[in-house]
């Protein structure tokens, strides 16, 4: 079984600040981490490796410094790491990102592609499903459990819903998007860390993925972020102990004070 896990390097959102003049994220000096949902997906892949001897590849698209999360994944136990980096890929929105990653995946053998549900720096939850559409593969999102049947080569996925869950079955090859909250990723071991720095991280450019330039990077991005801003904190609420009859009058008076009515 061959599994490919798509991961992303993201800024630690607990440290993120926003430039008030430009409305953009200030990334300089902010520590970067592996996206939590992606790390959860990686753990599911490694569990299948432990149980069935699966070969696990990780791929990320980003700047050269994204190699750090690939080394982390190698230290956790993956077999192969690929960094997709090129100036032509810069400025990509989710559609252009998924086009580039899908192009890379077309050159690889896989039975299962795992992505995180969404990245904490964008929260779109679009890239995983878009990859599935580019590759014309069945997909299940919001995965919170994953099982494999060797005899039938099918995956059984528990999908989170708002008020419960579904259990679905898909034939390989297929795509799933994972939830960080559903699994505890393993820690890197000392031996894994040492071994990770002896392993090769493959570096691929845009010429390796065979995707037209008008479909990648800024040129292939029909959307762009106009502005980012911090959440506006609301003032503390008030509590009143009144009868139902008094409550109506109180609410009306408060609405008048706010010039709502």
Where are these regions (language model features)?
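N-terminal glycine-rich FAD/FM-binding segment characteristic of electron-transfer flavoproteins
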Residues: 1-261
């Amino acid at each position: 079984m061959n599994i490919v896990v798509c991961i992303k390097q993201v800024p630690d959102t607990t440290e993120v600040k926003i430039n008030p003049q430009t409305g953009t994220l200030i990334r300089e000096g902010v520590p970067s981490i592996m996206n939590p949902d992606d790390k959860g997906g990686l753990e599911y892949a490694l569990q299948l490796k432990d149980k069935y001897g699966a070969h696990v590849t990780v791929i990320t698209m980003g700047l050269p410094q994204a190699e750090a999360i690939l080394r982390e994944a190698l230290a956790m136990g993956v077999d192969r790491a690929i960094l997709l980096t090129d100036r032509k890929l810069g400025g990509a929105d989710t559609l252009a990102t998924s086009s580039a990653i899908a192009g890379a995946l077309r050159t690889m053998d896989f039975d299962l592609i795992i992505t995180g549900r969404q990245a904490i720096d964008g929260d779109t939850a679009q890239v995983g499903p878009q990859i599935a559409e580019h590759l014309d593969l069945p997909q299940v999102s919001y995965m919170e459990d994953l099982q494999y049947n060797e005899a039938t080569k099918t995956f059984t996925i528990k999908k989170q819903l708002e008020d419960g869950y579904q259990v679905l079955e898909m034939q390989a090859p297929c795509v799933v998007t994972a939830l960080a909250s559903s699994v505890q990723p393993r820690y890197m071991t000392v031996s894994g860390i040492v071994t990770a720095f002896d392993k090769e991280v493959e570096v691929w450019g845009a010429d390796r993925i065979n995707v037209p330039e008008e479909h990648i990077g800024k040129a292939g991005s029909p959307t762009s972020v106009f502005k980012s801003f911090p959440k506006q904190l609301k003032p503390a609420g008030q509590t009143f102990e009144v009868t139902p009859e008094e409550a109506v009058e109180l609410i009306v008076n408060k609405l008048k004070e706010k010039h709502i009515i």
